[in-house]
């Protein structure tokens, strides 16, 4: 991988330097690219860039990256990436595994981390693929994940959370877990998945329900617990 990170942040309510950690990559021989600020390298100064250059020859599966400078990733500097295995032992279980089969869960705060209450009150919103509602505003956009009846999907579930864990489920659907934290997993069929900050799962989903809309739910461990008006929710659309 060659990933050039450019620090162009200029919001004075947030940290303007940065350092990116590629979560759970072993970094054998490239510890300088691991991204722990002030441990492996200095942060990238505003207006400058840094090229992270590393390999992952024996690792496949679901990963994520995030700022490793103080609380910066809680303000949104985080994301997912998938390393595909050309010899995936689960390939016969699914028909679709692409950029549309990623599901990210994150907590979102209306106040920048360094100005807030250190998360003691819980997040204002749970974001599913970057969108979510907060109490008192039922108009905010919800993520819609489109699937086709009769197809089999491999979904990559990633917790980008800064603090809470979530219980993830899809109404009227079962999920079969096949990967945990980039390690192939014995098949385990469940109704829900409890996922903590930094964890990743892959699950196989067969779309065998009636054509309809189904709630995707991510119940946080603290904060706003309700699903009222679409809080902590997204939509699976058959």
From Swiss-Prot:
Species of origin: Trametes hirsuta
Localisation per UniProt entry: Secreted
Biotechnology: Able to metabolize the endocrine disrupting chemical (EDC) 17beta-estradiol (E2), and so could be used in biotechnological and industrial applications that require the biodegradation and bioremediation of the environmental pollutant.
Annotated Cu cation 1 binding sites: 21
S-S bridge residues: 74-162
GO cellular component: extracellular region
Residues noted as binding Cu cation 2 in the record, renumbered to the chain: 23, 66
Protein name from the UniProt record: Laccase-S
Entry keywords, A to Z: Copper, Disulfide bond, Glycoprotein, Lignin degradation, Metal-binding, Oxidoreductase, Secreted
Ranges of residues in domain Plastocyanin-like: 4-87, 100-238
Catalysed reactions, semicolon-separated: 4 hydroquinone + O2 = 4 benzosemiquinone + 2 H2O
Functional summary from the UniProt entry: Lignin degradation and detoxification of lignin-derived products. Has activity towards 2,2'-azino-bis(3-ethylbenzothiazoline-6-sulfonic acid) (ABTS).
């Amino acid at each position: 991988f060659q990933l050039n990170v450019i620090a162009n942040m200029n919001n004075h309510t947030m940290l303007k330097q940065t350092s990116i950690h590629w979560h759970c990559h072993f970094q054998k021989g490239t510890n300088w690219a691991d991204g722990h600020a002030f441990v492996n390298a200095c942060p990238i100064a505003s207006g400058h860039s840094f090229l992270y250059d590393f390999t992952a020859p024996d690792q496949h599966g679901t990963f994520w990256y995030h700022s490793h400078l103080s609380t910066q990733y809680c303000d949104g500097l985080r994301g997912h990436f998938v390393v595909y295995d050309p010899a995936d032992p689960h390939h016969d279980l699914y028909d679709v595994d692409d950029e549309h089969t990623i599901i990210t869960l994150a907590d979102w705060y209306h106040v920048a981390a360094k100005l807030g209450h250190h998360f003691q009150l819980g997040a204002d919103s749970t974001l599913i693929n970057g969108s979510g509602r907060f109490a008192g505003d039922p108009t905010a956009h919800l993520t819609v994940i489109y699937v086709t009846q009769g197809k089999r999907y491999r979904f990559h579930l990633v917790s980008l959370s800064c603090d809470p864990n979530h219980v993830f489920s899809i109404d009227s659907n079962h999920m079969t877990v096949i990967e945990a934290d980039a390690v192939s997993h014995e098949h385990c069929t469940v109704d829900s998945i409890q996922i903590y900050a930094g964890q990743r799962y892959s699950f196989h989903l067969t779309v065998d329900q009636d054509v309809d809309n189904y709630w995707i739910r991510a119940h946080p461990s603290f904060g706003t617990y309700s699903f009222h008006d679409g809080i902590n929710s997204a939509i699976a659309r058959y």
